[in-house]
């Protein structure tokens, strides 16, 4: 009887686990709301509607690092402050008393700061710091109190550690950088995972505030190229790029030289102090009885000889003395 009862119980447990999963697969019912992705961040913002009502919303961004490139929602972001507009998941709190949430996708304008810092204890490692600030949500101004900062420790383009924490917006580096220097990202539908079709003719570039257009010539059998946006050649930009490369080279050089220099100084200091200590101990254990190289006058036998000194230039007195001795 016990074996007959245990079999239906196990079947019931199996059906209890399998039926909800089968229902999610066969029906169009959405899955339970999940948290941010593994490499994602949640930014709490406050938006103001046209009627003047404030609403609390949460923007979910997926930030990844792959082969030396930082991606925000699959959009490539370079070092500096980049302003991008992309579609992302937004969680809106409709009823605070019942804790009701509404999930939808909207167009979000975000400022992303990416900094690359060398690590002192390893020349091949670097720390990538990422900060994000939401500017607009579907054309509505957004405000936030805190900034989520992500620190990615990378060695040879391989992620070693991924950490994130919150800090006040006024204390962040992103807040201190003027929005006029932001790099504008054009054509936000570009994705690193998407395939470019044969009829797609528009290219995607990271653009600055000053933009020019370059006309493309149509090839036989293909659609004409859309005018491309490009930055005019500038000696200042080339100089900045060269200085940035020089700065990175100097950082790598000093990160490899400074540890060796400190090790050398440690060896020198320890050697000098150790030698002084050994000499002091030897002096205490084996003191010197007498000093060598000093003539001892007590042990010498001497005979005193009288010496008569004559004044200089007195020949007459000398002759008188000789005469007296003759008499």
Curated annotation (Swiss-Prot):
Enumerate the glycosylated residues. 44, 62, 146
Q: Where, in residue ranges, is this chain on the Extracellular side?
A: 24-259
Annotated Gene Ontology cellular components are: membrane
Q: Which residues lie on this side of the membrane: Cytoplasmic?
A: 281-327
Instruction: Name the encoding gene, please.
Output: Ginm1
The organism of origin for this protein: Mus musculus
Question: According to the entry, what is the taxonomic lineage of the organism?
Answer: Eukaryota, Metazoa, Chordata, Craniata, Vertebrata
Q: Which residues form the signal peptide?
A: 1-23
The membrane topology noted for this protein in its Swiss-Prot or TrEMBL record is: Single-pass type I membrane protein
Q: Which UniProt keywords apply?
A: Glycoprotein, Membrane, Signal, Transmembrane, Transmembrane helix
Q: InterPro entries in the record, alphabetically?
A: GINM1
Its transmembrane ranges are: 260-280
Coiled coil start-end: none
> Which cell locations does it reside in?
Membrane
Q: Taxonomically, which superkingdom? A: Eukaryota
Which protein is depicted? Glycoprotein integral membrane protein 1
């Amino acid at each position: 009887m016990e074996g007959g009862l245990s079999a239906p119980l196990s079947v019931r447990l199996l059906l209890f686990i399998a039926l909800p999963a089968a229902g999610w697969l066969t029906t169009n019912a959405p899955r339970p709301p999940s948290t941010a992705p593994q490499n994602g961040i949640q930014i709490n913002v406050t938006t103001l509607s046209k009627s003047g009502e404030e609403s609390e919303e949460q923007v979910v961004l997926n930030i990844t690092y792959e082969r030396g490139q930082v991606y925000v929602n699959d959009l490539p972001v370079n070092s500096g402050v980049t302003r991008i507009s992309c579609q992302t998941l937004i969680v809106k709190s409709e009823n605070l008393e019942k804790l009701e949430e509404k999930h939808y996708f909207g167009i979000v304008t975000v400022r992303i700061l990416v900094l690359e810092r060398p690590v002192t204890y390893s020349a091949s490692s670097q720390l990538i710091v990422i900060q994000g600030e939401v500017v607009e949500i579907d054309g509505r101004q957004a405000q936030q109190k805190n900034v989520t900062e992500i620190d990615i420790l990378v060695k040879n383009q391989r992620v070693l550690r991924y950490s994130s924490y919150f800090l006040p917006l006024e204390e962040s580096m992103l807040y201190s950088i003027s929005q006029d220097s932001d790099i504008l990202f054009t054509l936000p539908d570009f994705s690193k995972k998407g395939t470019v079709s044969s009829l797609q003719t528009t290219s995607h570039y990271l653009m600055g505030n000053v933009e020019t257009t370059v006309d493309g010539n149509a090839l036989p059998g293909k659609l004409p190229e859309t005018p491309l946006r490009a930055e005019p050649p500038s000696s200042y930009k080339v100089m900045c790029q060269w200085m940035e490369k020089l700065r990175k080279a100097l950082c790598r050089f000093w990160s490899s030289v400074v540890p060796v220099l400190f090790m050398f100084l440690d060896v020198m200091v320890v050697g000098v102090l150790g030698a002084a200590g050994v000499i002091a101990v030897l002096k205490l254990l084996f003191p010197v009885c007498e000093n060598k190289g000093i003539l001892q006058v007590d042990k010498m036998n001497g005979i005193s000889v009288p010496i008569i000194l004559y004044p200089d230039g007195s020949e007459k007195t000398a002759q008188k003395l000789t005469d007296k001795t003759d008499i």
